[in-house]
């Protein structure tokens, strides 16, 4: 028997819009329906939603992905960045959450409705129901990935030819599915320097 649930989420973040950084706070209400009878997988799905919102998106800077140079500068400075296909207004952030949350739960649950409001948005609530058009999120992007990614920045460091490859799987939260084998990946790759003993 499938079960309908409602989750309320609240998290701080910022937006970079019109060359200005503005602090904001978001309130999100999710209506979900379970799609499996496996209670352990339902618990993992719920925990993934909370981990993504409270640990990955909290204190992020939402920015239009067209402003790639600014986004990369922010990331090099150590700032948590989330890129979006359009300007970071509440409606776009809500659509992103709808797509990404459906992705991270990988069919164990379904998002049936999502409401979002924010402090900057003057507490106006945007409503989204399953089946509504997803607009700019029809294009391929990280919002369809089941991992914890929330941007597609290069991750290239500014010193010593180092690339920092972020591990976006669920290992760090211990939230993998019990029937899937996830491999661990290295986080740092050196390039551009010839080995001293290479001929």
PLM region spans:
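Short, Gly/Pro- and small/polar-rich lid/capping loops
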Residues: 1-3
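Charged, low-complexity, helix-prone segments enriched in Lys/Glu/Asp/Gln
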Residues: 7-9, 130-131
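Histidine-centered catalytic/metal-coordination loop motif
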Residues: 8-99, 103, 180-199
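Short acidic, gly/pro-rich beta-turn/loop elements at beta-sheet edges
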Residues: 38-40, 107, 124-126
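Short, surface-exposed ligand- or partner-binding patches at beta-edge/loop junctions that are enriched
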Residues: 104-118
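Short, low-complexity, polybasic intrinsically disordered segments
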Residues: 116-156
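Intrinsically disordered, low-complexity charged/polar segments
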Residues: 148-199
